[in-house]
């Protein structure tokens, strides 16, 4: 109770079961800035992977991954700005909130695309290349139908989609980069604690954003290091 009283201005009460948490103005600002500052690095990083690509398939994969990475931070930032400054526009805010949830599914699919597209897979495992996008489409339909109604189910879908391709990736003969992939996944999982702690921990959602940024950086590093050319080769190519 003493903790809550001390930090009351930085945190509102918990949201009801089927409702949304209402951040304080401080939390709104933190939610915006923690992802807004990552938009430019995401764009630059995506362009670098495209520049390092050796063939058309690597370029396509770089674009898929880059678009998912950039879309995550851009859509998240726009939604939190609208939620903060234009919350009276209920329909607009609701649409952007749905987009914010839907883009997570496609970001997960895009994050696995380099591993599924550029590594040799077995005949059964190769089906995950398209199945993960089918899962993303299913998640999008779920958001349209049941947005904010069954939050635990939504979280279960995110975690299932995050872990299912990992089972395929870990079965590859070439295991380079899998430690980084697992490390990033662990960071995401730890961040979920804060994702579900609005109204319990001040700035919980902004802290979740930092976990997302850290995990995404770890995964980007693994993709850059193990699936695309080394920086020395890049400099030599220039």
UniProtKB/Swiss-Prot annotation:
Keyword presence, Transmembrane: yes
UniProt entry tagged with the keyword Transmembrane helix: yes
Annotated GO biological process: positive regulation of neuron differentiation; regulation of protein localization
Residues exposed to the Lumenal side: 50-61, 123, 173-174, 220-238
Keywords: Endosome, Lysosome, Membrane, Receptor, Transmembrane, Transmembrane helix
Topology relative to the membrane: Multi-pass membrane protein
InterPro entries for the chain: AdipoR/HlyIII-related (IPR004254), Hy-lIII (IPR005744)
Transmembrane portions of the chain: 29-49, 62-82, 102-122, 124-144, 152-172, 175-195, 199-219
Molecular function GO terms recorded: pore-forming activity; protein kinase activity
Pfam families membership: HlyIII
Domain of life: Eukaryota
GO cellular component terms, semicolon-separated: Golgi apparatus; late endosome membrane; lysosomal membrane
Subcellular location: Late endosome membrane; Lysosome membrane
Coiled-coil region list: none
Record topology, Cytoplasmic segments: 1-28, 83-101, 145-151, 196-198
PANTHER family in alphabetical order: ADIPOR/PROGESTIN RECEPTOR-RELATED, MONOCYTE TO MACROPHAGE DIFFERENTIATION FACTOR
Recorded family membership: Belongs to the ADIPOR family.
Annotated function: Involved in the dynamics of lysosomal membranes associated with microglial activation following brain lesion.
NCBIfam families, per the entry: hlyIII
Protein name as annotated: Monocyte to macrophage differentiation factor
Originating organism: Mus musculus
Gene that encodes it: Mmd
